Every structure is written in C-alpha cells, then in structure tokens.
C-alpha cells in the first residue's frame, strides 16, 4: 500500500486511538455482521466496506502492526515490512473476497472465527484455530488464535458453599461477579452437587447478549447429620440400661428436639425411623430421619453403677457370643 493510500483505520472501525483490543474486536464484529457479502448479495459498496474494515482490523488487532501504524502513520508499512505485498495480510492470506466461497462455512459465526483465526495465527494460510473457554457449562468458541483475548461469551460456573441449615431452609446470597453484585435465591432442599441457574449473568458476547451463570452447590459437612438420598442419618448414643429396658429419649432433628421411644432389647447399630423428619424434596415431600443407636458403656462408672453391673454379670443368663462359638474349629 503506497503512502498516498493512507487510511485512518481507527476512523474506518469507528473507534478511538486509545481503544482496547476488546473494544476493537467488538466493533469489528459489529461491522462485519453489517457488511458481510452474504448479508448484502450483489452490493458492491458493502463488499468494499467489508474489505476495508477487515484490512483495518488486521492491522489494529496485531500489537506489533498497530504500534508501527501509530508511530509512523502513512509510512508504517515501510518500517520493516517493505517486502510485503500491498494489501496482504501475511503469508497466504489476502483480503480480496471477490469470488470467495462462503458456502464452506456452516454459519457466519464460523466464518468470522476462521477469519480472525487466520489474522492472528502465525503463517495461518487457512488453518482453523479456536480459543475455547469452558468452565463446565456449554463451551463457547471465541475468535481463533487470540492468546491474550478476553474471556469469550457463554455460560460460566462458580462454586457456592452452604451450611446445612442454609440448604435446608433456603437462603438468599449476595454474589460479587466482579462487574456487578447479584442476589441469588437458593431454594430449600438443595443438596451437594445441586446446580442453580442464574439467567443472563454469564459471559457477555460481542452481540451484547450474556450467557448464564451456573452455581454448583457444596454443603459444608455436618458433625451430626449425613445424607442417604432424601433421608438424614444420625448416630445417637444410648446407655446399656436404656437398650435393655427401653427408654423415651430426646433426638435432635432439623426442626428441633423431638421425643422418640426406644424399644426394650435394641441392638447397637439398629436404626429407628422418624417419619417426615428428613430432607425436603420439592417433588416428593420430606424424607425420613434414621437414628442409628450406639450402645455406649460408661467411661467412668460410679461405685453404685459398678456394683449394679457386677450383680448383673453374676446373674446373667445369656452368653452373647454363643452363636459364633461353632466357628472356633473351622480351620482345625
């Protein structure tokens, strides 16, 4: 391109000289959508405009070329690029779209990504390179070959930690997304691994649209309650006399303390069920709470307790190990 053919690339793209790479990229995308030949069949003016904005973007999107353009103005190509043919965008890549076969692309987005990939891939004479950004949700292919590109549009994910009480009752959380604060309502009954979708709070696209934010919920482990499906499981200690004679005891539940009858003669590890005291399920109602009884001997029995146990031992009529004594000679 001769010095007399100097073009103001900033004016062509409609950006200021201080525009960031992201702003230049966004503006090019906007103009490319408007003047693309497929959207303006037979319109020579639109075709020429498309070539012009593509030429401007090729220079301004390349930090090295942009620096020379800003420094040397109309003579920027003579600053170390005199051997490059006029109108060329690198080895094997030009901007003459006359007779270009756009039918090889599935849609216009695919063409734009390819075009930008060629402009920003060293020696890219048609090799397709894409920058993929995915945080677990659906991926989004950004402009190809941008090593320092901004995160592309699409869905994004974040992990949100909840206490068991918050997950049980539901809670509102204020989240800092960097560019804004949002309030998210977590419904009652959330579980570990549940996902909450927040519409329109994902990554912004060059079209001005935004993807969605997906929150992966993690529940802080609880010292007393564990999950079995929609049921809550807990272990509760009982004394030997309560196991033998039965008892009426207090049990912690998500709703508070409730009374539960322990039948006489229960075994250690046996579970009793509290109906409707488990985890809330919006579709099936609440699960149950399973109370696993653990018979616990006193660590420091009083003199009276020891005397009572000694009397019981002396009067015991059953051998609790009798059922397994038959296995004693199994390997003899």
Swiss-Prot record:
UniProt GO BP: chaperone cofactor-dependent protein refolding
InterPro entries referenced in this protein's UniProt entry, alphabetically: DnaJ_C, DnaJ_domain, DnaJ_domain_CS, HSP40/DnaJ_pept-bd, J_dom_sf
GO cellular component terms attached to this protein's record: cytosol
Keywords: Chaperone
Protein's name according to its UniProt entry: DnAJ-like protein slr0093
Residue ranges annotated for the J domain, each copy included: 6-75
PANTHER family reported in the protein's UniProt record: DNAJ HOMOLOG 1, MITOCHONDRIAL-RELATED (PTHR43096:SF52)
Lineage top rank: taxon: Bacteria
Molecular function (Gene Ontology), one example: unfolded protein binding
One Pfam family of this chain: DnaJ
């Amino acid at each position: 391109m001769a010095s007399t053919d100097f073009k103001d690339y900033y004016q062509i793209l409609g950006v200021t000289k201080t525009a960031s790479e992201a702003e230049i990229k966004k503006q090019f995308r906007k103009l490319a959508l408007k003047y693309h030949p497929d959207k303006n069949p037979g319109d020579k003016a639109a075709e020429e405009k498309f070539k012009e904005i593509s030429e401007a973007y090729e220079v301004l999107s390349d930090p090295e070329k942009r620096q020379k353009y800003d420094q040397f103005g109309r003579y920027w190509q003579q600053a170390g690029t005199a051997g490059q043919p006029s109108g060329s965008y690198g080895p094997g890549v030009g901007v003459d779209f006359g007779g270009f076969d756009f039918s090889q692309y599935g849609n216009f987005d695919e063409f734009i990504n390819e075009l930008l990939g060629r402009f920003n891939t060293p020696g890219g004479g048609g090799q397709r390179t894409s920058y993929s950004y995915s945080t677990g949700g659906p991926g989004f292919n950004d402009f190809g070959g941008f090593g320092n590109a901004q995160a592309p549009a699409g869905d994004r994910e974040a992990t949100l930690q909840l206490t068991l009480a918050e997950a049980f009752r539901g809670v509102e959380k204020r989240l800092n997304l960097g560019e804004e604060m949002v309030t998210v309502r977590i419904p009652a009954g959330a579980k570990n691994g549940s996902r909450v979708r927040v519409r329109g709070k994902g990554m912004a696209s060059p079209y001005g649209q935004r993807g969605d934010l997906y929150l992966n919920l993690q529940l802080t482990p609880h010292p007393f309650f564990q999950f079995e499906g929609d049921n809550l499981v807990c272990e509760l200690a009982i004394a030997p006399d309560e196991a033998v004679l039965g008892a009426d005891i207090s049990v912690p539940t998500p709703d508070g303390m409730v009374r539960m009858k322990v039948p006489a003669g229960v075994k250690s590890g046996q579970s009793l069920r509290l109906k409707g005291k488990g985890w809330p399920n919006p579709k099936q109602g609440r699960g149950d709470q399973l109370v696993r009884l653990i018979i616990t001997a006193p660590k420091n029995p009083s003199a009276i307790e020891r005397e009572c146990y000694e009397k019981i031992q002396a009067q015991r009529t059953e051998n609790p190990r009798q059922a397994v004594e038959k296995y004693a000679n199994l390997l003899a």
